[in-house]
């Protein structure tokens, strides 16, 4: 899949260039971290051993944001967690750094709410959607404009992420220029003579999620009427095929009926891919599907010295210099799609993509004309292919593209932001659980509620009894912090006073842990606890909302302290004092 290839290429190129002191990866769970750690060990073992990577889960982001001074956060897709990360950054981070994400497929109906999430007061001037093509820039701009109009005043005045265009790149080292002997061998295997022309279409073989190749077969049929017989042509269709997909069968039957020599090569390896590029004469890609946004295979073909005949569609038009590195074929799209729009959230995206693709016309006569001009003129093919190789290798290698990212992040960090406004912003789509579900329990915790340790709590404090702490709450229920809280409540104390004391202690622990930070994993347990053996609480402090002196982000720390207090009440380590 193009998305996976692009994301891996981005990370690999960034780490090879190595412009930063450390690289942090935060994934959803420890299983994903284990897989990533294995991959890093294979390709970047030295950096891993030197502590250049910090690996953590999403749940550890608040701790990491307080602990490290980040240059930027970059997501592999602009529709993953941009707004959620901006919320966490605004609340926890030492500074307002850029949050960026790259476009890939933009056509799924479920994406509209994800764009809406990014329209809020907490979006900073340093937050950017990185669109890979002019078409993607236009689409994302249209989405934000439409949402602003449809939601009216609720969105007016909300900040929007900026949109910058940076293309995807390719790993040029994986695309060596063709070898003459290998070219001859592959062509012989296909039954292609020296004077035959091989047309290569390399993409996911799917009429509903990539491109409909039947119009290409019709264009080849037209070539016969233009003096180029099918006996001199070979159409090679290569790429991933979904199990059970009937597309290859349909293509094969239609090609046979038209007398076209079709070779279908499913899921070729990288080596086989390069051999096919080297054996071909023209790369053809009449894409018609809005699932496509960029077009990595056009760059690969160009880097291998092939002229490209492609539809003038989406990101393709950015990659082909028409008349110099290849030829663009005009396309025609629908003026209205109300019937599709109304069903798009109720049917599979593949059905929507297919319907839209079948209303997107790649001009068959123009496609035939473009192919004819290159088939009939081998010198033009060689000239365009050589220019394509120069153009792609000068502009689209990952090492070049990564430089554009680094320049963007530096520029974004220099932009002014209203830090106080950002830190106070509340996302309108945030699920405020205490407010929304406050009617579920009999009552809520109050500041004047009097509590003390129970017999079980005293036993835990003295080490006689060990609490059972579920893995999912281990970040809140720290054993040493629990002992501190129990000791502080031994004589009786208000919930408000205990909350502030525990929050203040959390701040001290975090400062101690920050001073002991290293290039280890988040939560590795290397930093020692800074809790004292005993601490006399100040009973005069009783307001849950009162900030403890010097506490960074007191409301958040007090929220976590309340969580520990409630957990201790739940498990009978604290008890309420009857009034």
Q: Can you say where each PLM-predicted feature lies in the sequence?
A:
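Extended catalytic core of nucleotide-activated donor transferases of GT-like folds
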Residues: 7, 33-122, 503, 575
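Acidic donor-binding loop of glycosyltransferase active sites
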Residues: 278-292, 306
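Nucleotide-sugar-dependent
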Residues: 286-296, 317-318, 335, 339
């Amino acid at each position: 899949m193009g998305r996976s290839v692009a994301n891996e290429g981005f990370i690999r190129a960034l780490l090879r260039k190595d412009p930063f002191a450390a690289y942090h990866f935060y994934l959803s769970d420890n299983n994903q971290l284990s897989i990533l750690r294995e991959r890093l060990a294979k390709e970047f073992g030295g950096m891993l051993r030197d502590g250049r990577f910090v690996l953590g889960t999403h749940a550890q982001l608040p701790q990491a944001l307080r602990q490290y001074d980040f240059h930027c956060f970059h997501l592999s897709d602009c529709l993953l967690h941009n707004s959620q990360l901006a919320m966490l950054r605004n609340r926890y981070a030492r500074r307002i750094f850029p949050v960026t994400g790259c476009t890939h497929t933009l056509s799924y109906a479920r994406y509209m709410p994800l764009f809406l999430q990014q329209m809020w007061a907490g979006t900073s001037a340093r937050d950017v959607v990185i669109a890979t093509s002019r078409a993607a820039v236009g689409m994302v701009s249209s989405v934000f404009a439409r949402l602003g109009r449809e939601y009216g005043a609720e969105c007016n005045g909300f900040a929007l992420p900026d949109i910058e265009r940076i293309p995807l790149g390719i790993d040029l080292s994986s695309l060596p220029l063709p070898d003459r002997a290998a070219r001859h061998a592959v062509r012989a295997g296909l039954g292609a003579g020296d004077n035959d022309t091989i047309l290569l279409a390399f993409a996911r073989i799917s009429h509903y999620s990539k491109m409909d190749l039947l119009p290409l077969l019709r264009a080849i049929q037209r070539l016969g009427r233009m003096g180029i017989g099918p006996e001199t042509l070979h159409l090679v269709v290569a790429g991933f095929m979904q199990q059970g997909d009937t597309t290859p069968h349909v293509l094969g039957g239609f090609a046979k009926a038209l007398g076209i020599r079709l070779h279908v090569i499913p899921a070729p390896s990288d080596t086989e891919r390069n051999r096919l590029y080297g054996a071909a004469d023209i790369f053809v890609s009449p894409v018609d599907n809005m699932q496509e946004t960029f077009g990595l295979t056009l760059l690969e073909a160009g880097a291998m010295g092939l002229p490209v005949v492609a539809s003038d569609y989406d990101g393709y038009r950015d990659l082909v210099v028409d008349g110099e590195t290849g030829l663009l074929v005009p396309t025609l799209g629908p003026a209205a799609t109300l019937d599709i729009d109304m069903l798009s959230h109720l049917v599979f995206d593949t059905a929507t993509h297919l319907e839209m693709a079948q209303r997107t016309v790649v001009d068959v006569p123009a496609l035939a004309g473009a192919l004819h001009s290159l088939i009939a003129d081998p010198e033009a093919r060689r000239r365009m292919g050589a220019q394509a190789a120069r153009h792609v290798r000068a502009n689209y290698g990952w090492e070049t593209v990564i430089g554009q990212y680094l320049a963007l992040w530096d520029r974004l960090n220099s932009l002014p932001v209203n830090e106080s406004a950002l830190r106070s912003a509340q996302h309108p789509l945030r699920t405020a659980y205490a407010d929304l579900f406050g009617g579920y329990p009999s009552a809520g915790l109050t500041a004047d509620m009097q509590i003390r340790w129970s017999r079980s709590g005293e036993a835990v404090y003295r080490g006689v009894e060990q609490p059972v702490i579920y893995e999912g709450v281990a970040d809140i229920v720290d054993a040493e912090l629990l002992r501190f809280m129990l000791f502080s409540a031994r004589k009786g104390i208000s919930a408000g006073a205990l909350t502030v004391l525990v929050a203040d202690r959390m701040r001290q622990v975090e400062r101690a842990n920050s001073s002991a930070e290293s290039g280890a994993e988040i939560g590795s347990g290397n930093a020692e606890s800074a809790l004292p053996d005993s601490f006399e609480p100040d009973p005069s402090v009783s307001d849950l909302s009162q900030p403890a002196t010097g506490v960074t982000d007191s409301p958040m720390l007090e929220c976590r302290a309340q969580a520990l207090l409630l957990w201790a009440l739940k498990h009978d380590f604290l008890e309420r004092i009857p009034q």
